[in-house]
UniProtKB/Swiss-Prot annotation:
InterPro entries in the record: Staygreen
Protein name from the UniProt record: Magnesium dechelatase SGR2, chloroplastic
Subunit structure as annotated in this protein's UniProt entry: Interacts with the light harvesting complex II (LHCII). Interacts with the chlorophyll catabolic enzyme (CCE) RCCR.
GO process annotations (BP): chlorophyll catabolic process; negative regulation of chlorophyll catabolic process
Length: 271
């Protein structure tokens, strides 16, 4: 997705190693031309490849989930990763996060995966998307601001990938297009450790409304599920093992990058 650690300073006269049509989503900042040398230095930062979603670049895997059916009692979970070698996206659709898809030194270093899950809270469906901004190692901390910007810029493409890969679900349940999208940015830096509501799914997929600067941010947090087991909510234990401590920042959140913090049942935690 975004090999931020391997971003190159490419002279403007050199041809990039990837096709022009795949570099449209790059964040390019050209410095002033040097008076001594007639060429620019262009730092290139890539995240999800093309800014415009290309279905041909998406590989969809259904793991323990029927492609044409949505389980009534369990949430639907998406795990999206990108290969810098093939420039293709891999989307796993299952009932829990696909941890095997996140193995390998590159994935652990760059942390460019995006995971999401459908939740039902008090009878209402919503899509919860998680992005890792910083924490875990110092390099991600240094570029937290850039990672936050790029994730915001490219998330509409991610949502399109979710919708395309799980098209049977959305075709059978068109009302999900109106479901709100909650985006969780996980960071050990309070400024970027936040939750944003991007509005209904159909609106969140509109790229021109989300450029990392203009999208509307929520001033409230998602509604919590019922504290006790009920029929109007999905299970309160999230299928995504990342910290959800956006409600109250604690010292333990400094390790949020590890993605291994257990998410407690909010109802049982009171007891």
């Amino acid at each position: 997705m975004c090999s931020l650690a391997t971003n190159l300073l490419l002279p403007s006269k050199m041809k990039p190693v990837f096709p022009e049509k795949l570099s449209t989503s790059s964040l390019c900042v050209t410095t002033r031309r040097s008076k001594m040398k007639n060429r620019s230095i262009v730092p290139v930062a890539r995240l999800f490849g093309p800014a415009i979603f290309e279905a041909s670049k998406l590989k969809v895997l259904f793991l323990g989930v029927d492609e044409k059916k949505h389980p009534a009692k369990l949430p639907r979970t998406y795990t999206l990763t990108h290969s810098d070698i093939t420039a293709k996206l891999t989307l796993a659709i299952s009932q829990s996060i696909n941890n095997s898809q996140l193995q390998g030194w590159a994935n652990k270093l760059f942390r460019d995966e995006v995971v999401g899950e459908w939740k039902k809270v008090k009878g209402k469906m919503s899509l919860h998307v998680h992005c890792h901004i910083s924490g875990g190692h110092f390099f991600l901390n240094l570029i937290a601001k850039l990672r936050y910007y790029i994730f915001c810029k490219e998330l509409p493409v991610v949502l399109e990938a979710f919708a395309h890969g799980d098209e049977y679900l959305l075709n059978n349940h068109p009302e999900l297009q109106e479901s709100p999208v909650w985006v969780y940015f996980h960071s050990n830096i309070p400024e970027y450790n936040k939750v944003e509501c991007w509005g209904p799914l159909w609106e969140a997929m509109s790229q021109h409304q989300h450029d990392g600067r203009t999208h509307k941010k929520s001033e409230t947090l998602p509604e919590l599920p019922c504290p006790d087991e009920c029929k109007c909510c999905f299970p309160t234990v999230s299928t995504i093992p990342w910290s959800h401590r956006h409600y109250q920042h604690t010292a333990a959140d400094e390790n949020v990058a590890d993605g291994l913090l257990e998410i407690p049942n909010p109802g049982k935690s009171k007891g």
